[in-house]
């Protein structure tokens, strides 16, 4: 998504290409805000700074010494990390360092009557609202990263439902902002996911949908919008989404600006594309064929 290509290699280093996307949008004149629900000094590391990964004791002298190293390792093209540091404070207050291994009593990650996800979503919406009201302020690219589906009890997903629904309802009323909801997988660490067949199907059921306001659709033009509608029924990748984002950043005020080969989802994806055509697909990825959700008898001739 961030780099527009797979960064997997033999080194297995944790890379996400975040600097590729943010540097481009800074050149396009955007302000960039990215925040997450992970804590930067946890052993699992941080999405915002994948090259920095070191666990230290909170509030220790060692923490003070390594904070400067963390800031140097963090993406220089970010204008703001939003509430990422608040994530650390909330997790520490609950006696944990990450949302992956929480006790059931803290599984909703609730702090002062609100969940951690609610804080991040509210901040993103508030930031966008202030940006939209002031025509003199640079447009914004905002990325909010939530690890909801990694919690073991399943409570956090249920708690986040209402907050995410409210956020999307508010974004649907925006006149100038394209909103993209994207997941990499369904809940995968709950007993439901691990022990039931329907739960195992959810693990491999990521979602993606895009909210395009009427005003933005007019600027994009008929060809781009037609391609978006068509591609809802095509095999698409996050690389296509990356191309779409870059195309938005490059757009002039003219909706008739050329649609290039790298325009991603703004160009019709081939109806004959298969998983074999996708470069850099991870070996543990599951590609579904048409009719995957139909149950077959073991004696069926369709079973090999």
Task: Mark where each language-model region is.
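Beta-strand elements within well-structured catalytic alpha/beta cores of enzymes
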Residues: 1, 25, 139-146, 157-160, ...
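Exoplasmic/lumenal regions adjacent to the first transmembrane segment
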Residues: 14, 23, 30, 270-304
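Short, flexible loop/turn elements at secondary-structure junctions
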Residues: 29, 36-39, 146-150, 183-187, ...
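Active-site-proximal alpha/beta segments of enzymes that process anionic O-linked groups
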Residues: 1-155, 205, 262-263
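Non-catalytic, well-ordered alpha-helical segments in soluble enzyme domains
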Residues: 216, 222-257
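Histidine-centered active-site microenvironments of extracellular/periplasmic hydrolases
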Residues: 49-53, 159, 172-177, 181-224, ...
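Short, hydrophobic alpha-helical segments
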Residues: 128, 132, 180, 245-253
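Fold-level signal for large, globular catalytic cores of enzyme and receptor domains
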Residues: 108, 167, 171-175
